[in-house]
């Protein structure tokens, strides 16, 4: 397996390790991946949720690992809220998506979101979050962005992103603004294709500037190419990263997009070449896989992760030896990563909050955010629904097309939430229509056009129909429902808020879908 030459300089090895495996180096600087797996359920840059099955188990594993390393432990996680949450065990309270916060138009709520997520993460032993998303939303939505964005208005998104950074880092968890210089305007999913756009949308840099001014610890450089700036992907472009350093004044850690994804590294000739290009351009941490995997990894997958890290490690070493990459650049990057460890890493004497208290605070905040953000797009005058008619709840299956979407596994909370107010009968799409009257609630998460088609069937039968989008509000496009509701999230807090709005007499708030130019507003 490729790796360091036998006579590699130890100082340079340490620097490269910090760039390629910042969390793993702290976890186990001198032991093998196999030993690491036995000690902490971790290998190949991941903490597997097939071996660590609860926040308490994660906390124990990280605490145990910290006892044997000489400096603070730093492990990253994607815990954005909404559809992307690595910590998605059933006992973890989930916050609504960023687009919900944008709909509520309350930066204080975004700061609260950052604060309670920080509490949850620190209670589990994690101190680095790959959030917030600073990309601008577009319509039709981009698969890689969607509800992960705060909206399409640059100033509003900037206010939300800065507030989230203050909340998260005020809770002693490092924030990461992503995906610089902004994914708004791309038309393909960067997990599958190499996105190319001619220019940045107006105001695309404003959210990143606001995050930098708020003191964000890290910025993730995207894998997309903006031709007006450079013909190379952002993470490998000295000009794009220079814009971040020189124009925005960012002095923290620049992280690459996940280079393990073929669509990310193939345009540059492969994984090794992409890693060298990224560090040469100014990246400080080469991201390879996430720190916490979403599912089971077999031996072959773990071994592939080890090989990827070894390839990148050797590629950086060879690039320095061959004078394609300066040792000064390596040492500069390593110094920033060390500073991040000491600013946010988990020390052996760190006092961690109670999981129960942190999670309860997140549950309370989630409901507060949901109540401000659930949006009645059409039919406010119809609400609340009749107090005498029964309710038929029809769930439309999701398309399953979105990658990296933990919300798809969320329990179906809406029928139970509705049943707190009224007798509810659940039906499958295309089921025979029961006789009599009754309001029909057609709902789903990431349904595409299928929910609108199911809605049309019930409208044609003369029923009062409510369509609820539990994910991307694009699902409401073309709907003939009497009432359209954008909830932005399928989690419990949003489902309960929708039920109270439809049946419990809670008046619709001032929220509005924060994406301009949509066909259904």
Functional labels for PLM-detected ranges:
Residues 24-26, 77-85, 89, 127-137, ...:
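Short glycine-enriched loops at secondary-structure junctions
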Residues 6-10, 28-31, 38, 51-73, ...:
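Second-shell residues forming the walls of enzyme active-site clefts
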Residues 74-87, 94-110:
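Substrate-binding cleft of extracellular glycoside hydrolase catalytic domains
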Residues 34-47, 115-128:
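Catalytic domains of carbohydrate-active enzymes, especially glycoside hydrolases
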Residues 1-38, 267-521:
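Preference for extracellular/luminal or secreted protein segments
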Residues 2, 14-24, 42-46, 73-81, ...:
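Hydrophobic faces of well-ordered beta-strands that scaffold small-molecule active sites
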Residues 102-126, 133-154, 161, 165, ...:
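A substrate-binding/cap region within the structured catalytic cores of diverse enzymes
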Residues 89-102, 139-150, 189-195:
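Surface-exposed, active-site-proximal loop segments in enzymatic domains
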């Amino acid at each position: 397996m490729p790796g360091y030459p036998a006579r590699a300089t130890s100082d340079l090895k340490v620097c490269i390790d910090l760039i390629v495996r910042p969390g793993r180096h702290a976890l186990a600087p001198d032991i093998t991946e196999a030993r690491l797996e036995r000690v902490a359920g971790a290998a190949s840059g991941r903490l597997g949720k097939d071996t660590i099955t609860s926040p308490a188990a994660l906390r124990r594993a990280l605490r145990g690992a910290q006892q044997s390393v000489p400096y603070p432990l730093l492990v990253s996680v994607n815990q954005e809220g909404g559809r992307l949450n690595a910590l998605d065990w059933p006992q973890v309270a989930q916050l609504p998506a960023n687009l919900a916060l944008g709909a509520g138009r309350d930066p204080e709520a975004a700061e609260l979101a950052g604060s309670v997520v920080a509490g949850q993460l620190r209670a589990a032993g994690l101190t680095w979050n790959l959030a917030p998303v600073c990309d601008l939303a577009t319509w039709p939505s981009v698969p890689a962005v969607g509800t992960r964005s705060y909206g399409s208005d640059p100033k509003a998104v900037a206010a939300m992103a800065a507030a989230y950074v203050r909340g998260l880092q005020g809770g002693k968890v490092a924030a990461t603004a992503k995906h610089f210089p902004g994914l708004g305007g791309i038309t393909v999913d960067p997990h599958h294709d190499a996105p190319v756009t001619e220019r940045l949308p107006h105001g695309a840099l404003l959210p990143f500037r606001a995050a930098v001014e708020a003191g964000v610890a890290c910025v993730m450089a995207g894998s997309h190419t903006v031709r007006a700036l450079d013909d190379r992907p952002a993470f490998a472009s000295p000009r794009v990263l220079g814009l971040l350093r020189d124009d925005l004044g960012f002095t923290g850690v620049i992280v690459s997009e996940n280079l393990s994804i073929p669509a990310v590294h193939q345009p540059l000739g492969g994984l090794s070449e992409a890693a060298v290009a990224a560090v040469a351009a100014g990246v400080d941490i080469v991201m390879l896989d996430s720190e916490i995997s979403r599912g089971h990894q077999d031996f072959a997958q773990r071994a592939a992760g080890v090989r990827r890290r070894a390839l990148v490690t050797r590629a950086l070493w060879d690039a320095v030896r061959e004078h394609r990459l300066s040792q000064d650049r390596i040492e500069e990057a390593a110094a920033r990563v060390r500073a991040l460890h000491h600013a946010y890493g988990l020390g052996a004497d760190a006092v961690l909050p109670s999981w129960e208290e942190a999670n309860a605070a997140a549950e309370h905040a989630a409901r507060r955010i949901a109540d401000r953000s659930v949006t009645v797009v059409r039919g406010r005058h119809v609400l609340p629904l009749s107090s005498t008619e029964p309710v038929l709840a029809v769930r439309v299956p999701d398309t399953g097309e979105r990658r990296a979407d933990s919300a798809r596994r969320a329990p179906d909370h809406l029928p139970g939430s509705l049943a707190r107010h009224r007798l509810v009968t659940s039906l499958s799409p295309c089921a025979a229509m029961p006789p009599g009257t009754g309001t029909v609630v057609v709902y789903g998460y990431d349904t595409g056009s299928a929910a609108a088609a199911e809605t049309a069937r019930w409208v044609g039968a003369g029923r009062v129909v409510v369509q609820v989008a539990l994910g991307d509000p694009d699902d409401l496009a073309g709907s003939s429902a009497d009432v359209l509701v954008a909830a932005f999230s399928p989690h419990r807090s949003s489902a309960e808020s929708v039920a109270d709005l439809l049946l419990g007499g809670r008046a619709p708030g001032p929220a509005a879908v924060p994406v301009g130019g949509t066909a259904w507003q």
